[in-house]
Each structure stands twice: as structure tokens, then as C-alpha cells.
């Protein structure tokens, strides 16, 4: 394939997953940590793989913000809802969504060549909150104004302060107005048991993308996993066996997703270097 040929992701649902797994393995190792939990149906002793989240404004270069805006701005040349379609395009790349978003081959090609997933690992943060705030702060009945990262960090540290580390990993955390999921990010350094809701389907999708990149145990939880079942000795844990799909409904509900992902599948997908 020549470099100037159109790259299409229309028939490549899930094409981002092998890149995501490789990047996570290079930086944080959280997907491998989750696969170990699934294989053993047991939470390993020791700390959860940590991610040093920061506020977006703490990154001088703001590479992720520039990259996202470049993609969205290109879409607005042809689309009135570029942000929503771009989010759907990423979701398609993560193996989610029922159908490919309605974008032209040219936009699909531009986004494929331009979107840089690796930057999210270089600048770990809730980048979607800033994008959503700029898009939804005015003229929108569901206006969005995110809680500052410094406040979220403080709230998380206060919530989990003084607790026994091994028990905290099973303690349930629920955000009833999760937005793009910033509370999930900071809480993920302490617990594996996370869920939330939001009234906006767009924000829910952004939270899902954050989950795939940073919080795999929120993005994927297979049937039969018993690590969060209630026991007489652990009243902090809750039974999540019936919550296996991270999908948004009309009321903005969020539940844990169950894409068709396995370690074997992702290993096979990782052998494919690029879309052809």
C-alpha cells in the first residue's frame, strides 16, 4: 500500500486494541494485571499498578489536547457534530459500537493517520473533560463543568486514607454523576471495584474511552469472575455479577462493559502491524 492511499477502518472494528495493549504494557501494565486476575479469579497481593495522573493544565506541551483538537477541527469542515462522531470513531476502534460512524473516507483516513493514542500514556490525565467542557459549557441543557483534578485528588485521598490496602482493592466506589470519569481515574490507584452514572451519553462514552486506556477492570469484566462477591468477612465488597456491560441507556446509566476480548485474541491482533 502506498503512503498516499486511503486507510479505512470501516471494516476494522477493534483495530485500536492491539496498540492499546502494547502501550499499556510499555507504561503501566494494567491490562496484564487484569488478565492475571481473570486467569486466577483472585486479586494479587501488593499495590495496584499506579498511574501518576495530573491535571491537564500541568502538562506544558499539552500534546493530547492539541492532537484531539486537530482531529475534531478537521471533522468540522464537513460535520456539524464532529466531536460526537470522533468519539464514536474511537469507540469503534476499541471494539464498541453497533455500526461504523457516518464519516467520509477522507475523514476516516485523516483521523487514522493523525490520532495518537500513545500521547495519553505520556500525559496521563482526564483529557476528555477539557474537550467536553469547551463543547458543552454553553447552549447545552446538559452543560458540563468538570470537578478540578486537584479537588478530585484530595477527595480520593481523603476517602481511602487510613484503610488497609488489600481491603481497599475490593471496596466499592460509585460516582452518580461521573462525567468523563475523572473520579474513576484517581480511585483506580486504590480500588478495582468502580462504577458510575451520568445523564449524558456523550460523557459516558468519554468515560468508557478513559476506562479502556487507564482502567481496564472498568472496561472489561467477564462473566464468572467472583472477586467482588459478598462474603460474611468482607462487607465492603458488593456483588457485581449482574453488571457485565458498560453501556449507556437513555437515563445515562453506566455499567461495566463486556466486549469479546481475551488475552489470546489480543495476542493475535497484536501481530498485525497496520491497517491495509
Predicted features by range, described:
Residues 145-242:
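Conserved S-adenosyl-L-methionine
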Amino acid at each position: 500500500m502506498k503512503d498516499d492511499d486511503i486507510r479505512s477502518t470501516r471494516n476494522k472494528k477493534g483495530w485500536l486494541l492491539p496498540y492499546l495493549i502494547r502501550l499499556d504494557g510499555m507504561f503501566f501494565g494494567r491490562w496484564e494485571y487484569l488478565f492475571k486476575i481473570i486467569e486466577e479469579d483472585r486479586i494479587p497481593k501488593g499495590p495496584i499498578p499506579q498511574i501518576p495522573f495530573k491535571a491537564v493544565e500541568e502538562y506544558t506541551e499539552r500534546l493530547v489536547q492539541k492532537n484531539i483538537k486537530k482531529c475534531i477541527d478537521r471533522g468540522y469542515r464537513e460535520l456539524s457534530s464532529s466531536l460526537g462522531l470522533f468519539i464514536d470513531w474511537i469507540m469503534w476502534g476499541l471494539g464498541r459500537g453497533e455500526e461504523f460512524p457516518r464519516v467520509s473516507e477522507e475523514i476516516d483516513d485523516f483521523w487514522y493517520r493523525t490520532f495518537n493514542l500513545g500521547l495519553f500514556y505520556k500525559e496521563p490525565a482526564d483529557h476528555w473533560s477539557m474537550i467536553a467542557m469547551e463543547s458543552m459549557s454553553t447552549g447545552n441543557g446538559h452543560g458540563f463543568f468538570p470537578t478540578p483534578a486537584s479537588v478530585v485528588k484530595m477527595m480520593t485521598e481523603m476517602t481511602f486514607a487510613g484503610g488497609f490496602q488489600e481491603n481497599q482493592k475490593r471496596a466499592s466506589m460509585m460516582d452518580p454523576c461521573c462525567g468523563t470519569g475523572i473520579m474513576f481515574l484517581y480511585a483506580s490507584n486504590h480500588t478495582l471495584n468502580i462504577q458510575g452514572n451520568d445523564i449524558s451519553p456523550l460523557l459516558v462514552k468519554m468515560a468508557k474511552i478513559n476506562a479502556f486506556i487507564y482502567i481496564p477492570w472498568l472496561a472489561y469484566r467477564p462473566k464468572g469472575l467472583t472477586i467482588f462477591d459478598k462474603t460474611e468477612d468482607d462487607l465492603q465488597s458488593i456483588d457485581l455479577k449482574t453488571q457485565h456491560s458498560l453501556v449507556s441507556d437513555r437515563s445515562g446509566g453506566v455499567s461495566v462493559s463486556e466486549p469479546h476480548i481475551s488475552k489470546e485474541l489480543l495476542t493475535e491482533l497484536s501481530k498485525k502491524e497496520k491497517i491495509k
